[in-house]
Structures are given as structure tokens and as C-alpha cells.
Amino acid sequence: MASSTTNNPALDLDSDTPENPGHELAQFASGCFWGSELRFQRVVGVIKTEVGYSQGHVHDPNYRLVCSGTTNHSEVVRVQFDPQVCPYSDLLSVFWSRHDPTTLNRQGGDVGTQYRSGIYYYNEEQDCLAKKSKEAKQKEFKDKRVVTEILPAKRFYRAEEYHQQYLEKGGGNGNKQSAQKGCNDPIKCYG
């Protein structure tokens, strides 16, 4: 990671790079990161997923601190993908299908700023595609405003290990869910 360009490293742009130079990174916030991650794990062309925290103002946050509502972090899924196999527009389609983008700071029973809807881009092309997709989604919601924020991807803080691939590993009750590419089984979130 490059040295901080501000007095607060949490406010820096995410300067991590994909493991393969032909791959790209993307960050999405759409409520609890467990179900969101599993949905992205199933996408052909997604190489790796990690859950974590981004867009906040506290350096090196943890789950408990983020859930306190004092850090302004989003729960995010950072996706490493091969754009030759999975265009960014496909990831945007997965993002929009996974949550209600008209609810501010909540998804279902999960309430708090960490559950907000957000697309955090790494380059101008992602920014442009994200904005176009939001405009298209807004047309579907005639009477509701899409509240999804679209911002540059700030520093990514990887969540604690037990959150990584949580539903694939069985979640809180041991019922493993498939992360197989192309799987369309319903995603059941549980702690």
C-alpha cells in the first residue's frame, strides 16, 4: 500500500492491485456483506472475493467498531475479476439484483450506515458505467429514489477471517451454501 496522502489513511484511495495484471478490482456495498459476497463468488469470471470495510474515517476498523455506527464505513465486497470473462457491467447487474437500492442505510432488518448501498469505483470507466446503470435503475423505480452512492474506492480494510466466505463455510448454523460458479440456489443469510 502506498504511503498516506492525507493525515488519515482511511481517507486514501484504495491503491491495492489485483494479483494478475489483466484483472481488475471492484467494491460494492449492498447490505450485509455475507450474502453479497456469496452472490459474487458464484459469478463466472470472478477470481476472488473479500469482505471488509471501506468509505469510513477510522483507520484499521473492526466489525464491532463498524457496527457501532461511529466510523461511517460500509460493509463491502471487494471483487477481483477478469474483465475478458466477466465485464464490469455484469457485476453491476449482480449488484442491483441483490438488494433494495431505495432504502437509506438499511437492507431488510439490518439498519445502520454500514448497510448502505454503494458502488466504489477504481477507474473512470467503472465510474461511468456505474452512473449509467444507476440512471437505468432509477427508471425502474418511478415513485422511489435510488439512494446508491457512487464514489471512488477508498482504502479497503479486510474484515476478520470468520467473515470471509462466511455462508460458503456454513455461517452460524453450519448449513454450507454453494459458491459454485453459475449456482442459482437461493441465498439464506443467517448469523
UniProtKB/Swiss-Prot annotation:
Listed GO biological process terms: cellular response to oxidative stress
Entries under InterPro entries matching the protein: Met_Sox_Rdtase_MsrA_dom, Met_Sox_Rdtase_MsrA_sf, MsrA_MetSO_reductase
GO CC term, one of those recorded: cytoplasm
Catalysed reactions, as listed in the record: L-methionyl-[protein] + [thioredoxin]-disulfide + H2O = L-methionyl-(S)-S-oxide-[protein] + [thioredoxin]-dithiol; [thioredoxin]-disulfide + L-methionine + H2O = L-methionine (S)-S-oxide + [thioredoxin]-dithiol
Record keywords: Oxidoreductase
Positions in coiled-coil regions: none
Region (Disordered): 1-20, 168-191
Alphabetized SUPFAM superfamilies for the sequence: Peptide methionine sulfoxide reductase
Entry keyword Oxidoreductase: yes
EC assignment: 1.8.4.11
GO MF term set: L-methionine-(S)-S-oxide reductase activity; peptide-methionine (S)-S-oxide reductase activity
Pfam family, one: PMSR
Enzyme class: oxidoreductase
Gene3D superfamilies per record: Peptide methionine sulphoxide reductase MsrA
Function noted in UniProt: Has an important function as a repair enzyme for proteins that have been inactivated by oxidation. Catalyzes the reversible oxidation-reduction of methionine sulfoxide in proteins to methionine.
Family: Belongs to the MsrA Met sulfoxide reductase family.
Listed name of the protein: Peptide methionine sulfoxide reductase
Species name: Fragaria ananassa (Strawberry)
